[in-house]
Amino acid sequence: MKILYWGTPEYAVPTLLALHAAGHEIVGVVTQPDRRRGRGKQLMPSAIKVCAQSLGLAVFTPERIKTDVGCQKELADLNADVSVVVAFGQILPKSVLEQPPLGCWNGHGSLLPRWRGAGPIQWALLEGDSETGVGIMAMEEGLDTGPVLLEQRLPISLDQNSHDLGEKLSQLTATLMVEAVDLILKAGVGTEPERLERLNVRYQGQEMSYARMLKKEDFQIKWGDPALRTHRRVMGLYPSAMTGWRNKRLKVLETEPLIERLSDEISEEARALLGRWRTGEDHPGTVLGCINNVGIVVSTSGCPILIREAQLEGKGRCRAQGLVQQLAASVGDRFQSF
């Protein structure tokens, strides 16, 4: 099978490696152009570009594939049988979708039609979904609207952050895409309706939700929220949820909500703290306790929340006792909105 691969972040690397290892001919890799990143704002290649070059594959980096007619022709001349897309970062135009005879297929990190769009992993965590998964979808001009060929579900635990969940979903995408490509090859060529009928795809229902682009304010911890919502913000937007501490930014990296009904899902250290503080008596964001070797307990609009790991502006990451010592917090101190 001659495959044209489209992807950009680290999330897309396992699928490229899996397809290459399965013996398919990767005729080209399309990724986003090099971007300036980090403190030094150095021009850096995407994770997929680095991976593709290590495999000796041809790389294409259109700034905007929709209007880059020259790149579109170069890709058409590769005569790929199929296009595989995982987190590319641009919407493919109809002219590109119609190029490969076996279609364009996308590995999407949600249970479609829930969380169509660019941030399905983050939104599944932010909204407290009990499960998520991966779908292999035939691409259309609409955003993540196509019929689903394969799908696999994955439970979400309370202690998972977006990085950990993303790693699991990226590996799951790789496994599922290799299986999907074999099915697509066996189904053979024909009109799109004929191919999709032979593949017995599932058409998406109408009860959809959209994973909108995240805004700056989404990353700001709102201590007036309940503990569980604050926890979901921290874990869903890992490692970027932030608050203020003595006029410096503090990235909050790991929390546990001190909620009785979640006692089976939190750590032994957190369970030992249940019931020690009366709910809602202190101003949200107030330090209620600095627990040696555990972390810092903070008030919310409801039950308290335990901060287990954080990173103060200009400092390294600290957890448990190191966090207590670095912040030098006292009961009654307050975190600030930033």
Swiss-Prot record:
Q: Which residues bind (6S)-5,6,7,8-tetrahydrofolate?
A: S110, L111, L112, P113
Top enzyme class, one word, equals transferase
What's the Enzyme Commission number for this chain?
Answer: 2.1.2.9
Q: Which SUPFAM superfamilies match?
A: FMT C-terminal domain-like, Formyltransferase
Q: For this protein, what is any one GO molecular function term? A: methionyl-tRNA formyltransferase activity
- Matching InterPro entries: Fmt (IPR005794), Formyl_trans_C (IPR005793), Formyl_transf_N (IPR002376), Formyl_transf_N_sf (IPR036477), Formyl_transferase-like_C_sf (IPR011034), Met-tRNA-FMT_C (IPR044135), Met-tRNA-FMT_N (IPR041711)
Reaction(s) catalysed by this chain's protein: L-methionyl-tRNA(fMet) + (6R)-10-formyltetrahydrofolate = N-formyl-L-methionyl-tRNA(fMet) + (6S)-5,6,7,8-tetrahydrofolate + H(+)
Instruction: Pull one GO CC term from this UniProt entry.
Output: cytosol
List, alphabetically, the Pfam families matched.
Formyl_trans_C, Formyl_trans_N
Question: Which key words are in the record?
Answer: Protein biosynthesis, Transferase
Q: What family, per the record?
A: Belongs to the Fmt family.
**Record's function text:** Attaches a formyl group to the free amino group of methionyl-tRNA(fMet). The formyl group appears to play a dual role in the initiator identity of N-formylmethionyl-tRNA by promoting its recognition by IF2 and preventing the misappropriation of this tRNA by the elongation apparatus.
Record's protein name: Methionyl-tRNA formyltransferase
| Organism per entry | Synechococcus sp. (strain CC9902)
